[in-house]
């Protein structure tokens, strides 16, 4: 019966170790080594999946909430003193602008009239229209009636000697020249006389226009 010696077993182990060495140059050995490496990597991955906690296999909503919480947590860590100062400065700026916009909104617009209908009346003291009926106006009706007469008295071309009121006439005044025969006529005579017989060349009628 043949027996293996101790030296032969040692040589066999050495040969086995040589065959499993990384310094193999043959193409077949390289392919086998690659397959063994892939097989070992798959085993490692399988063990890792088996050791994974069941909390990781949650629903998509839970995953989204968890991821959002983690993002918020990470972003909160980025807030430093400079960012906080900028934030408070921006908030104060927004509040100031909001207060200014509120004041502008409450203030009356220049193009928008805030007066009542009574203030828009010509006789009102708040009226923006110049009127002879206004209390602040120093121009009276008497001045308006005699304005033309005073202007004509200042000139040499035409003089006003008398203003006579005539009944049944649309004219307010009859202006007579110096050479007119109606200069000395009394009011009673004019009332009784026929207006058609008056010398219209020496007198003229005028009317009063209100603006």
Swiss-Prot record:
Keywords: Phosphoprotein. GO terms for cellular component: cellular bud neck; cytoplasm. Residues 1-73, 96-123 are annotated as: Disordered. It comes from the Eukaryota. The modification Phosphothreonine is found at residue 184. Transmembrane segments: none annotated. It comes from Saccharomyces cerevisiae (strain ATCC 204508 / S288c) (Baker's yeast). The keyword Transcription does not apply. The keyword Phosphoprotein applies. Residues 26-35, 53-62 have a biased composition (Polar residues). Present with 1200 molecules/cell in log phase SD medium. This is Uncharacterized protein YBR071W. The modification Phosphoserine is found at residues 182, 186. Residues 63-73 have a biased composition (Low complexity).
């Amino acid at each position: 019966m043949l027996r293996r010696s101790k030296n032969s077993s040692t040589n066999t182990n050495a040969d086995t170790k040589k065959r499993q060495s990384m310094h193999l140059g043959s193409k077949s050995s390289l392919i086998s080594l690659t397959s063994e490496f892939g097989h070992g990597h798959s085993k490692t991955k399988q063990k890792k999946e088996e050791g994974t906690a069941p909390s990781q296999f949650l629903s998509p909503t839970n995953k989204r909430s968890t991821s959002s919480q983690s993002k918020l947590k990470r972003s909160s860590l980025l807030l430093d003193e400079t960012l906080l100062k900028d934030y408070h400065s921006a908030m104060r700026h927004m509040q100031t602008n909001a207060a200014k916009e509120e004041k502008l909104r409450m203030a009356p617009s220049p193009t928008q009239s805030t007066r009542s209908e009574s203030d828009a009346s010509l006789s009102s003291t708040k009226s923006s229209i110049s009127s002879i009926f206004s209390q602040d106006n120093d121009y009276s009706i008497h001045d308006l009636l005699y304005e033309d007469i005073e202007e004509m008295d200042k000139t040499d071309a035409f003089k006003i000697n008398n203003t006579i009121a005539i009944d049944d006439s649309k004219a307010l005044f009859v202006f007579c020249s110096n050479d007119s025969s109606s200069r000395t006529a009394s009011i009673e005579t004019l009332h009784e006389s026929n207006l058609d017989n008056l010398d219209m060349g020496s007198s003229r009628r005028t009317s009063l226009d209100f603006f």
